[in-house]
């Protein structure tokens, strides 16, 4: 991307956020397809077609000579610019345009990192970093909003959102062209409420994923602005303890200051500690405020989406619950805040007494019933959780079969290592172990029990990670653990996506 940045710096069109001239540059299509200047000019796709720079040059020449890339939304079907290879050429240009439209946001990211002097790290991308945040922030909170973000109802909303970032009209017309072109070939709305991930199955995944992420980013930018206004004094007061003097008096003054212009959002200032987290299309907002206050948050968000983004959101897409009695279904975990009682016996001189303490504990659990359904769908077990053989793998070698089962088992162990209850994880491992044994037994036409007896204990070792073996030696064991492995919560910070079995939606 640094090489990409060097090309952009030499383009005068970037100075005014004019992106349309960049689409006539041949080198941008190399970067759009993930290839450097010294790599092959052919890019293999999922099908049998190949992209070549010769085709790109011809398309650029035709675009430069004709004026067919600025159509209206109504006559996009009558446009014959692409000829008989309409879908192929359209996809090529749209993927190149996807790389171009990401330029402003990449530059903003670099500028932000340089300003904040943050070091790039892959750990920043780990989705497991969310759970230590929840453990730290959610314990003193009371209520939570479980939100499914709404989708844009009309294509023009996406174009209007991008106007502040892409200033030349030609780029917006080209964006509108690709949106309507793909829309007319697929469905009547870009993001259908019936299937929250339908946009991933469009021809140009990168293009539509970018648009969806940008749409959600606009939600967050305005929403977090309001949250920061309510928590500004609280966040700056930690720099010096003296600043906490008359803290709530300052907060009341801030409320009076915004009475005239922002009367609708005055209640935001009465709760200075909301915490939020988002992954994909799901958003969680938790607060220490009352249940009535969270109801205000709920209806405010609905009106906010309707008035500012012209997006209608059904109230049932926002669930209001108490953290102490409700489990959050988030990123493959069922998370809740449990109250744990501990009784301590204390004796002072001749008097002995008991101290009963109630401690809040963040409790992430494995959704075992959901995972049973995922394993059954992948043909590792039936709907009741009984292991079955994986018939499609019978033609593989024994080592490949064991390696595939072991890899799935280790990945699940890493992903659910932060679970507070490991018994469910052991049940998943057991299903995979027996399914592997039955697959091998079916291949060799023998009984599964006899096959397991022949393999011995070394076969089971394939299903435990090296990390588990090391932890069993250096960390204390909790309770009666028959397998002898550590049962505490450990979050691996190198996980950047949900496991396929955990993400079965």
UniProtKB/Swiss-Prot annotation:
Q: What does this protein do?
A: Usually encoded in the trnK tRNA gene intron. Probably assists in splicing its own and other chloroplast group II introns.
- The protein depicted here goes by the name Maturase K
Please name one Pfam family that this protein belongs to: MatK_N
What terms describe the molecular function in GO for this protein?
A: RNA binding
Q: Which family does it belong to?
A: Belongs to the intron maturase 2 family. MatK subfamily.
Superkingdom of the organism of origin: Eukaryota
**Coiled-coil residue spans:** none
Q: Name one GO biological process term.
A: tRNA processing
Compartment list: Plastid, Chloroplast
